[in-house]
């Protein structure tokens, strides 16, 4: 009976794999300028006021570049952040390493910091994008780190693997990957703002206690209410 049930589950998943949910290129309608640079699938949102000094790099969840990422990026741009989104689903569809990702990202930062004449960089990640964020920052060269003002992690899990897994997309995998997010966060010295939805079942990093780590809550579950976007933005607007 168990074998038959497992076979039915596998058959169902295989049949679902043909739908958009399980395809690499998952991008919804958006308001960005879409491009690919330094191996990174990016989405550009110019700041409302060009004279701003703030540059935001936003790593999406493994669901792709969809409505949440687009809506939040638009709001950041309206609040005078030059915003560059990265489609984590596309980029991490193939296995990466923290070193490789940091190498690609620092080239992107250098190019757009020069183009936009910004010297204040902020790193934001949602879900899978939040999981990999501390590893990437810790691999940046010292010169690049000096310009990163803060990290913001939205609904991170406890482990990650620098690759999108089918089981995660199907919501059938366990949070047991080789890269331990909490241990990497503890190495960080710059301000880190972490948020979870009030109704999320697991808040993997809620037990971390260190001076530079601030944890907060947002209305909603793993998908927040639209009214909470201002709260996400406000913590970075205050730094420095």
Each model region followed by its residue ranges:
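C-terminal motif of bacterial Sec signal peptides marking the signal peptidase cleavage site
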Residues: 17-18
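Conserved hydrolase catalytic core segment
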Residues: 136-148
